[in-house]
Amino acid sequence: MAQVFNFSSGPAMLPAEVLKLAQQDLRDWHGLGTSVMEISHRGKEFIQVAEEAEQDFRDLLSIPSNYKVLFCHGGGRGQFAAIPLNILGDKTSADYVDAGYWAASAIKEAKKYCSPNVIDAKVTVDGLRAVKPMSEWQLSDNAAYVHYCPNETIDGIAIDETPNFGSDVVVAADFSSTILSAPLDVSRYGVIYAGAQKNIGPAGLTIVIVREDLLGKANIACPSILDYTVLNDNDSMFNTPPTFAWYLSGLVFKWLKAQGGVAAMNKINQQKAELLYGVIDNSDFYRNDVAKSNRSRMNVPFQLADSALDKVFLEESFAAGLHALKGHRVVGGMRASIYNAMPLEGVKALTDFMVDFERRHG
């Protein structure tokens, strides 16, 4: 079978080595005669999987000991509700930074539980979309926390700054699309959450990193499966967890360690992004409308100068083994999601195709 590179924004490409291991365990896990999908989450075998996965995740991000790691259901959208339900405490408002589609979605959900102070950080610089620096975010004095999304997958916009608002400001962030792609100072955040389906593993699992002093504040109406304290007290097994997604994510963590960890992935991700943006910037045939200071390294949207060629581009790229390049319906065009599992070889195949496509159709 010819090589295929999956540029989907999520569920996303998984490392080939991980899929091979999972294939072996799918029918007979560790010689037990049962599938890894069938073992009990209460059994010692899965408990070992869970403990190793958490420790490897902690190692990869150097997570301080005063932070809890939770393996949850519900995806990022579930956390849009969980954040205010767990962190508001006796306050009624929180700061929400709007820099794109997913930040706006979090704001919409938060309005059910509090009065968000919306900080519109979207700006235009020389005709390109950008985000105000954090120094220009007008935080309010009575906010329980400030929430933002460091990477907007649809818009291709990234906020790479590290928060430095002071120790009394609780920062909550949606790292679904950038977790484990670059070094991260966890200590600057109160809550970090990430849906697994982009840089961690398959869909169905959400990982939450929460500072332990923020536990015990959940609203009385908070569903138990979203209550950080309940989840922590039950080792993320208050109900049956998504065991297969947890197991597969654990394999990805071990794979990441074998690649050299987050620092090594950061270098590769930079190389991939520079290669792809380089082809776009050196051409009048392709364009990207995000300022270089806020370009995403994980999700690269681009448009063709002649949109009438979009259908042809997608058909020919798919035939060439370059899949899932259609842009989100909100912005159109193309989008290449190049998460950790996408090898440099895959991005090189895409850029070679783009150059050839321009030669033939430009």
Curated annotation (Swiss-Prot):
The entry's cellular-component GO terms read: cytoplasm
Which residues are listed for pyridoxal 5'-phosphate binding in this entry?
A: 76-77, 102, 153, 174, 197, 239-240
CDD domains given in the database record: PSAT_like
Q: What is its main location?
A: cytoplasm
- A Gene Ontology molecular-function term? O-phospho-L-serine:2-oxoglutarate aminotransferase activity
Functional summary from the UniProt entry: Catalyzes the reversible conversion of 3-phosphohydroxypyruvate to phosphoserine and of 3-hydroxy-2-oxo-4-phosphonooxybutanoate to phosphohydroxythreonine.
Family per UniProt? Belongs to the class-V pyridoxal-phosphate-dependent aminotransferase family. SerC subfamily.
How does this polypeptide assemble, per the annotation? Homodimer.
Q: What is this protein called?
A: Phosphoserine aminotransferase
